């Protein structure tokens, strides 16, 4: 079974400008690797399809390093053998993702089969509805 976390599903004209993601995983397994997918308008496949959660936010290989760059970062990690809490962000200020009719922002297969996981998200977008 594949889990999908939908961060935003909006109608009308607009632009995605960024998101934050927080995870509270009560497992000793890596919580990431869910592909990020941005669906725009009437596409049959994602307009943006990434390779993994950590890649989208600017790090790799299950890193617990804290960093904060102008457009992406992992600003908090608390890691014990059976529990991880992490917060990250990415801003599309120079590469917004425009849509005319609707847009959907998702991460797929997050923590698939790993037990209890809590997620917190926020998505920033500009609405162009007239």
Where in the sequence are the language-model features?
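Beta-strand-centric surfaces of beta-sandwich/beta-rich domains
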Residues: 1-130
């Amino acid at each position: 079974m594949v889990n999908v976390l939908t961060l935003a599903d909006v109608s009308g004209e607009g632009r995605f400008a960024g998101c934050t993601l927080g995870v509270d995983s009560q497992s000793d397994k890596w919580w990431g690797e869910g592909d990020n997918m941005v669906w725009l308008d009437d596409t049959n496949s994602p307009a943006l399809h990434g390779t993994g959660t950590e890649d989208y936010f600017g790090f790799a290989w299950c890193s617990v390093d804290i960093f904060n760059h102008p457009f992406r970062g992992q600003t908090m990690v608390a890691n014990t053998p059976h529990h991880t809490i992490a917060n990250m962000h990415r801003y599309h200020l120079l590469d917004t993702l425009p849509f005319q009719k609707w847009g959907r922002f998702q991460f797929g297969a997050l923590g698939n089969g790993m037990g209890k996981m809590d997620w917190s998200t926020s998505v920033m977008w500009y609405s162009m509805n007239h």
